[in-house]
A protein has these predicted regions:
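Conserved GNAT-fold acetyl-CoA-binding loop/helix
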Residues: 5, 25-49
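C-terminal "cap" of GNAT-fold acetyltransferases
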Residues: 23, 89-93, 127-130, 134-141, ...
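A short helix-loop-beta-strand connector motif used in the catalytic cores of GNAT acetyltransferases and
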Residues: 46-62, 94
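A short, polar/charged loop-to-alpha-helix boundary motif
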Residues: 79-88
Length: 171
């Protein structure tokens, strides 16, 4: 594999990143209808800079090979939308948008991206990382467990079985 460069996303990359996120969402969740996908993409585009680039508890990293986007990961301030979770009261972020292009998988890129993201979060004063994933996403739960996350709760919904996970960061 060619050399990979991991960088903090910039405002001029937003259209490309939102396009990539939209494509990844269609691959991971093929059962979502096009209208829902379009609404999510529009919302993502409108809020990307505010949530990922301008917010002190936001970040977004890209991995590129020879200028080509091959993977992404980010975090945003946790919005409290799952009140049943027992998360820290302050400085909690939600890890989002980990995606590695299929031809680049199993090369350690996701682990490298996450390690840099966790380091950035720690330097930003983040106390806890939260994420949710689903068992139908190949290797997702195992990957996060290998990276220090613990399962907090699993929704009983038979389709999504949303798996809520968290990891405390060292002070």
């Amino acid at each position: 594999m060619e050399d990979i460069t991991i960088c903090i996303a910039t405002p001029d990359e937003i259209p490309e990143l939102v396009g990539s996120i939209t494509k990844a969402r269609a691959e991971m969740f093929p059962f979502l209808d096009q209208a829902s996908s379009n609404r999510m993409a529009q919302k993502e585009h409108e809020n990307f800079r505010k949530n990922h680039l301008d917010h002190p508890l936001g970040a977004f990293l890209t991995a590129r090979s020879e200028g080509r986007l091959v993977a992404t990961i980010g975090y945003v301030p946790y919005d409290g939308r799952f009140p049943f979770l027992n998360l820290e009261p302050d400085n909690v972020v939600e890890v989002v948008r980990l995606y590695v292009n299929p031809e680049w998988r199993r090369a350690g890129i996701a682990s490298k991206l996450f390690a840099q993201l966790a380091d950035k979060a720690q330097h930003a004063g983040v106390k806890q990382l939260y994420l949710h994933t689903h068992p139908f996403l190949p290797n997702a739960i195992g990957f996060w467990e290998q990276n220090g996350f613990s399962i907090m709760s699993v929704d009983k919904d038979p389709v999504w079985q949303t798996t809520h996970m968290s990891r405390l960061l060292k002070e």
